[in-house]
């Protein structure tokens, strides 16, 4: 626990003397100024604790000091040791530099962008590389070399990697070898102490069987780290995990007679909000609990920060962290909810924590929901029996009545104005917080629906105006085509259609090229005989593709009609096969399809051109032609043959896979924006893997035609995306590559994948509701 080492400790980021904070996940010590930047990055980048004023498990503090003294900082500053980097102007921050922008930019580049970490020479296949690194980590944790394991983790090794041959995770190996510090490092990077091996034994079992009882007890504490931290935040006590794993504080106020009405909200709305918390799925409840855990960490660090800083110089708006930073791995909705936790006052936040602890205990023990009125009556009876000696009680439970609070945190907890009672109810106080959050989300959704309705109305007006213009131009075009002479007798509609498609002498011309919408390049196949106005109506779509992906994926309950006007039959659901004459891949048809794919958003005023030989195909049909010509469809599409299966996966699973697809597409789009064409191939492999996993959720032969159509489009687009991305590598060295055209094709394929995924989410949600 001592901070004194064999050599003087300095800040890892600016070399300031006597650092007071530690970054647990990076294994370095930092000064106050640099710590303010670390806190603004978020726990997903750097987990910080004060060395003297925060509560530390002894082995965790020993792990941090071991890494710091053994040069863990060189992992994050590897390239700065290269003289070439010094000559290029890249340098480390100094203590005299300003926090903003010099220190902050350096720290963000160092830990968030990993700009100075040693890069592996070959990154073509990230999946194979990560697997090899994880196997090295699996072998290294049996030794005491922490720096090697941290270096492997920084390069992408997985702390929860399950070795396929040995049937264990790295934490199993560290527990068996008694490597406590290695186990601490693995847990910091997400290793699960309760994960079973191939025989169902956990790392805790390994440690006990090897005689490492202290390590086994520490792993149990790590397994209950979340609930222990929440309980310790409220009352300064933790369960000993021998008599029980949970302490459930209860709000109380002994100094007032009307304590129950002031400490608990007994309204019907509060009871409904409590029931909604209990009705959450395990995954959503875990996410909520982790978000509250991060908020507890932020508030505790805030309290230490305000107690230790010189308020006249350091405590400024820039150094403060008023809410949880954005985590790009989470959805926008979850990030907004995480930031709103900072608006809870102390009493509201304590009530939310009690509810989470009660619900966690109930779920872990498998108890059924109890009546809230029974709990309230029991709480009221216990409240009337309390003495009136203190305003605030320490909190204990029936399963841990003999444990004393930690001495290092006792003084801090006594200064908190919290009202606690000794109780071990499996159901805590009813709170309004969940109801308020849902109410705010509902108001936001309603406002968005109103806005979309207005946009829909304006687009409908614009559509009608365009239809009138098209009819007018069509009439003028017909007049210009008529040769001078006697007026011909009126013809039937079918004859007029033939006259439009046929020129003098029976020769066919290209049909009128319509202005393809930039919002919906993937237009569906249209039936014959439709007017150009109808075709434009089916092709118009009011939103950009990126908006469509975000709103459609994460707001699946909003009616699809509010997002777009386009309706029609997709290319994959046309009742004729690719081998039919309608979809025959002639040379000119292929060239025309390629041209339409490249100029999908361009408009042309040449109304005298007609299409030769090809029916009215949308862009989606053209892409279907290209796939048939180039690759004769991917074999994955053939797997959809077989008996009809009416089953559908759960909406939750489909949304999870869709989020993974969207995340990989966003990574590909970032690479395109940054002109990182060498990243196209690995990104397309990730997208193809995510698409394959998503398609595997559905039956081989779905009964619903829309599902089959969407799956065909999803698989075909993913396969075409791979083919386009492989074109970044020229077949011959030095051969020119049109990266601008290639990028357009890649973005188009990515859009088609996102659209197909959105359709599957919408269909699954609709079918599950019926």
From Swiss-Prot:
Keywords: ANK repeat, Cell junction, Cell projection, Coiled coil, Cytoplasm, Cytoskeleton, GTPase activation, Metal-binding, Phosphoprotein, Repeat, Synapse, Zinc, Zinc-finger. Residues 1-124 form the Arf-GAP domain. Disruption phenotype: Knockout mice are born at the expected Mendelian ratio, but have decreased survival compared to wild-type littermates, with about 50% of mutant mice dying postnatally. Surviving animals develop normally and are fertile. They are however 60-70% smaller than wild-type littermates. A major abnormality in knockout mice is impaired lung development, characterized by markedly reduced numbers of pulmonary blood vessels and increased alveolar spaces. It is found in: Cytoplasm; Presynapse; Postsynapse; Postsynaptic density. Residues 375-596 are annotated as: Interaction with NCK2 and GRIN3A. GO terms for biological process: brain development; cell redox homeostasis; cellular response to epidermal growth factor stimulus; cellular response to lipopolysaccharide; dendritic spine development; ephrin receptor signaling pathway; immunological synapse formation; intramembranous ossification. This is ARF GTPase-activating protein GIT1. The gene is Git1.
